[in-house]
């Protein structure tokens, strides 16, 4: 994405990986591992968030695909492919600004509500780079109901939370319908 903050990249990566699996591909996912310790390593379902970041663990659990983190996406990809030679497609989570990484398809995820904020680059605004970068991408995923007039094909998505997890009792979950009309705090 070209803006800072949550745009829906992680759910998009999960959806793309699972769609590729449904079509017979074997995806692997590489990520920087934001808020991890910066070491290049494989992410497993039982990995520690302080080492690999929380989003790569979620991706690993939701896709059951190999996931590797590290500051260099190229090295992460090399390690992943060495350990998992059956992987035939790589997905880079948050790799749009990682120009050293060759790519065949570029997807940009845009928050349909916030769009591009005030249109200014960091530190004055939310843009990591110019909006002109959009035109270099193959298509955009717009998170939210807002339609954007872009010069590239777009796909709209809306994230809907269906399950709540009790943080005090991790084994306890409930459906959003179970909470309808009840006070929650």
Say what each PLM segment does.
Residues 1-45:
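Walker A (P-loop) phosphate-binding motif
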Residues 1-12, 16, 149-155, 162-164, ...:
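Short intrinsically disordered, low-complexity coil segments enriched in acidic
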Residues 1-3, 48, 90, 176:
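Short, flexible coil/turn micro-motifs enriched in small/turn-prone residues
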Residues 3, 7-12, 26, 63, ...:
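Residue-identity detector for threonine
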Residues 26-30, 108, 185:
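Conserved beta-strand elements of the Class I
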Residues 33-156, 163-169:
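Phosphate/Mg2+-binding loops and adjacent switch elements
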Residues 169-175:
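A short helix/loop element that forms part of the nucleotide-sugar donor recognition site in Leloir-type
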Residues 178-185:
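P-loop NTP-binding site
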């Amino acid at each position: 994405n070209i803006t800072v903050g949550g745009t829906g990249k992680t759910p998009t990566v999960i959806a793309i990986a699972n769609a590729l699996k449904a079509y017979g591909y074997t995806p692997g996912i590489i990520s920087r591992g934001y808020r991890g310790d910066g070491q290049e390593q494989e992410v497993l379902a039982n990995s520690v968030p302080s080492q690999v970041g929380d989003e790569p663990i979620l991706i690993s659990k939701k896709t059951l695909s190999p996931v590797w983190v590290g500051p260099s996406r190229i090295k992460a990809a090399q390690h992943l492919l060495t350990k998992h030679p059956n992987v035939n497609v790589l997905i880079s989570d948050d790799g749009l600004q990682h120009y050293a990484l060759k790519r065949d398809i570029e997807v940009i995820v845009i928050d349909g509500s916030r769009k591009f904020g005030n249109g200014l680059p960091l530190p004055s605004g939310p843009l990591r780079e110019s909006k002109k970068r959009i035109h270099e991408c193959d298509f955009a995923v717009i998170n939210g109901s807002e339609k954007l007039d872009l010069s590239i094909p777009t796909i709209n998505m809306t994230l809907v939370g269906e399950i709540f997890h009790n943080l005090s009792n991790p084994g306890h979950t409930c459906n959003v319908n179970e909470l309808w009309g009840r006070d929650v705090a």
